[in-house]
Structure formats: structure tokens, C-alpha cells
């Protein structure tokens, strides 16, 4: 008798995606992050839903409603900190997932890669708007600084900023609309993630060797379900360690002070996962130039398939390309550090050098290294 999972239309869909899916036999732990991102998204939606039950998106009560959640709601503190630190875990998994795609040449699956870039942008937008909601000092001033970047758009910049704000400054209207978008975007992300999977399953997963997986495939269940569950336990271990021992480690202390439009904090900075882009933004003296560099730092990912000059898909057997890849990783860590530092010497210079090197590595060094390797292997 045919199992129900193979006959029922709904279960058949799940079966083809998670159970009987033919998967390459040699994919490593780096292929775990897709499922971990799915787990993070589910966690964020569930905790966010419970937070939304007690939160009030109003400038006069938002801050105290967050304090109320933390102090008075049953297990409100753990829901809040799971949501805040869950976002950090989300971005750690996201960066590692993108890094894996870059290293093993998964970007050659164009549709999957491009939807992934849209997912990254949507997640960044969601996280930014979520950071504004507690209505602390850094929430308010972070929102003011980042939304003000729109004023760099020629001719319509000022009107655009006021349109986004819903007034002449970041105020109640801004908070209300940010809450609305913060609530709806995760569901859009879920739909995009389903599309991401749909296109991935059209081609099948890549593998560390960068060669065809067709001759040697195994069922996703039980092999990779067990492997993914191990990854999930490790993720939960990290998350719960953070939530239960040091929940404010990645936050900003000034966000425990209620938003005050008359008092600017000495150093305005976003959450840690935006610091690399923030450093690139600050390293360009011109406002419009900085905004363009900020946008390009993310959108450059869309150019990577066109910049792929190597004859091999994966970097596994390409030492020169590996060198440029790890240079890029170290450079991003330096940018993240610089983004959190005050705007003074020597941080300005380090930021400018690191920003220039970021674009040079992707646009020049990586394609050049691949061409040299082609020559060395006589694959001209």
C-alpha cells in the first residue's frame, strides 16, 4: 500500500521537500544553515506574535509597554529576549549561509541566489524597523539617522523623508507605520523563503566539490533531518546561553533610556549586524556617495555570478581564490568593528581603507585570482 505522504496532495508537497527529497551524499554542516534560518524565522514569528499582544505602537506608551512586558507579563522577559537575541542568531545564520554560497559557488543558481538577496534586504528592513519599536534613545536616533539618508536623493529627497516619517520628524506616525511593516514583513519573508526553496529544488543542492550530484544522491530523511536537528540543538544552546546569561550583551545600554528628541546620544550606531554597512556609509565624506556605497555593499552580491571567471564552481581546490575569500571575511569583521567606533582618527582611515578593500576584493581580486588559477591549470 502506498504511504499517505505519497498520495495526499498536501503531504506530497511536504514529502517532496523534506522527506523523499534526493540530496547530494556529501553535503557538509555548511548546508545546515538553510534549515536553521527557517527555525529562526518560525521562532521570530511566534515570539513576535506574543510580544505584539502586549505592545502598544504609540510614542507615549511604547517604551513603558516594553517595560510592562519584561516585568509584568508571565515569561514576558524570556519572550522579549528570545526575540531580540533571536534576531542576532538569524543574522549570524544568514551571513554564514551567504558565505557558504560564495565559497562553494552556489550563486550560479541564479534564481535561488537573487531571491536570497531579496530575502536579505527584506530581513534587514524588518530588523531595522523592529529596533525602532522599543522607543529608546538608540531606537529613536537610529531611526532619525537612517531615514534621513533618503534626503540624499536629488530633488525629491526632503519630501521623501517627510513622507516616510509622516510628519516633520520621527514621531508617533513613524512608530505606527514601522510597527505595521515590522508585523507584515516576516510573512512576506516566509513566502519568499518558499519561493527560494522552490527554485532550489528545481536544480537540486550544490555540494562542496562543485560537481554534479546526479550520480550519487540519498534521501533527505533520515540522513539530513538528523543532521539538521543537531544543528538546531547547537543553535538553541547558543541562543539560550545568550538569553539566560547575558541577554543585553549585543544591545545598546542607551536603549534603556526613553526616546528624547532634545537629547542626542554621543555615538549613534545600529545593531551589530548592520555595522559593516554603517562603516561603509560613514567612510564616504559625501552624503549621496555614502548612501550609494551603502546600497552597493549589499547589491554587489547580485553582480557576483557575472564576476565568476573560474572554470570550477567551488573554491575547494582553488587556493588563490580561497585567499581572496578569507581576505573578504576578515575585511568584513574589521568593518563591523569600525562601525561601532566613534568617528575619529585612526578609525576614519581604517574604515576608508577597509571599505575600498571590500569593493576591490569582490570586483578585482576575486575575478583576477580565478583567471590566474585558470592559467595555472591551463584552462584558458
From Swiss-Prot:
It is found in: Mitochondrion inner membrane. The chain crosses the membrane at residues 33-53, 77-98, 113-133, 178-198, 226-246, 288-308, 320-340, 347-367. Its cofactor is heme b. One of its GO terms (molecular function) is metal ion binding. It holds the Pfam family Cytochrom_B_C. The keyword Electron transport applies. Binds 2 heme b groups non-covalently. One of its GO terms (biological process) is mitochondrial electron transport, ubiquinol to cytochrome c. Gene3D superfamilies: Cytochrome Bc1 Complex, Chain C. The cytochrome bc1 complex contains 11 subunits: 3 respiratory subunits (MT-CYB, CYC1 and UQCRFS1), 2 core proteins (UQCRC1 and UQCRC2) and 6 low-molecular weight proteins (UQCRH/QCR6, UQCRB/QCR7, UQCRQ/QCR8, UQCR10/QCR9, UQCR11/QCR10 and a cleavage product of UQCRFS1). This cytochrome bc1 complex then forms a dimer. PANTHER family: CYTOCHROME B (PTHR19271:SF16). This is Cytochrome b.
Amino acid at each position: 500500500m502506498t504511504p499517505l505522504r505519497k498520495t495526499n496532495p498536501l503531504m506530497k508537497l511536504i514529502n517532496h521537500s523534506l522527506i523523499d527529497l534526493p540530496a547530494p551524499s556529501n553535503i557538509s554542516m555548511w548546508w545546515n544553515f538553510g534549515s536553521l534560518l527557517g527555525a529562526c524565522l518560525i521562532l521570530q514569528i511566534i515570539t513576535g506574535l506574543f510580544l505584539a499582544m502586549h505592545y502598544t505602537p504609540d510614542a507615549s506608551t511604547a517604551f513603558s509597554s516594553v517595560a510592562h512586558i519584561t516585568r509584568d507579563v508571565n515569561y514576558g522577559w524570556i519572550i522579549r529576549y528570545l526575540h531580540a537575541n533571536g534576531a542576532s542568531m538569524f543574522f549570524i545564520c544568514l551571513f554564514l549561509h551567504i558565505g557558504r554560497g560564495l565559497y562553494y559557488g552556489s550563486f550560479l543558481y541564479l534564481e535561488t541566489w537573487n531571491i536570497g538577496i531579496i530575502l536579505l534586504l527584506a530581513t534587514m528592513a524588518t530588523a531595522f524597523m523592529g529596533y525602532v519599536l522599543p522607543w529608546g534613545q538608540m531606537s529613536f536616533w537610529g531611526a532619525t539617522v537612517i531615514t534621513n539618508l533618503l534626503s540624499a536623493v536629488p530633488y525629491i529627497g526632503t519630501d521623501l523623508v517627510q513622507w516616510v516619517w509622516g510628519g516633520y520628524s520621527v514621531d508617533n506616525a513613524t512608530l505606527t507605520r514601522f510597527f505595521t511593516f515590522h508585523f507584515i514583513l516576516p510573512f512576506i519573508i516566509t513566502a519568499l523563503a518558499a519561493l527560494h526553496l522552490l527554485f532550489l529544488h528545481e536544480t537540486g543542492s550544490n555540494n562542496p566539490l562543485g560537481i554534479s550530484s546526479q550520480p550519487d544522491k540519498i534521501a533527505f530523511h533520515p540522513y539530513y533531518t538528523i543532521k539538521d536537528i543537531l544543528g538546531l540543538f547547537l543553535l538553541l544552546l547558543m541562543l539560550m546561553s545568550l538569553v539566560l546569561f547575558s541577554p543585553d550583551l549585543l544591545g545598546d545600554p542607551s536603549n534603556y533610556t526613553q526616546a528624547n528628541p532634545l537629547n542626542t546620544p554621543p555615538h549613534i550606531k545600529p545593531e551589530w549586524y548592520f555595522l559593516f554597512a554603517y562603516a561603509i556609509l560613514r567612510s564616504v565624506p559625501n552624503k549621496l556617495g555614502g548612501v550609494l556605497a551603502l546600497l552597493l555593499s549589499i547589491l554587489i552580491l547580485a553582480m557576483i555570478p557575472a564576476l565568476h571567471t573560474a572554470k570550477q564552481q567551488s573554491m575547494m581546490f582553488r587556493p588563490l581564490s580561497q585567499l581572496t575569500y578569507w581576505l573578504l571575511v576578515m575585511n568584513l569583521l574589521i568593518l563591523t568593528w569600525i562601525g561601532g567606533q566613534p568617528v575619529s582618527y585612526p578609525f576614519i582611515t581604517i574604515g576608508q581603507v577597509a571599505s575600498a578593500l571590500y569593493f576591490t576584493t569582490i570586483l578585482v581580486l576575486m575575478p583576477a585570482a580565478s583567471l590566474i588559477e585558470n592559467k595555472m591549470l591551463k584552462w584558458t
